[in-house]
């Protein structure tokens, strides 16, 4: 199965719990996204909530090489992903993706959302909305017998039909006991290609969509990914379980009941 782990019913229950926890953390953190707040302040709140309220641990902290220095990723405006929290205050009109992953009892929960800082331009809001629609189109393609190419194709069609571009160098991933497991989930592709989906697979769908061209560069910190043309970028992320009949989103907001 290309190293893809099919989860047991017991593991699926744990992943439902972890998905709920990360969604609750995103619900909690949203209230603090406003002009004047720094992403470092948000990061400290994330650490405290994961550890002291939820009894877990932020999986990004010290992850990878070089070791990631913070508890979450905060990607503002032209930052595509892996933005490192810092002391720069958010300002009116900014858009920000907050990407959280909690680890607890040996399992992971991973989700990200876009937040707006005060009032944002209609141009920025459209990018946010289309990116969400791109993610949902990918998720809605998930069912037994479909392929990951079907998922990527669906994401890509929505984004490109709106005049945007899809980042190709970063992708979704399997998740469970591992933070990043097989398979890689591309957000572009051809129908019918790639691994076939089977019940019990759990992976993320998390398209990164740029207002301008898809090209990117990585900053000297080894983590922060930005658009090469400095255009805005947006991303949403959910965890998806392949069920016997279709899909189940594991990271729906408990506050709103909406994905």
Residue positions per predicted region:
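Active-site neighborhoods and metal-handling regions in enzymes and metal-associated proteins
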Residues: 1-259
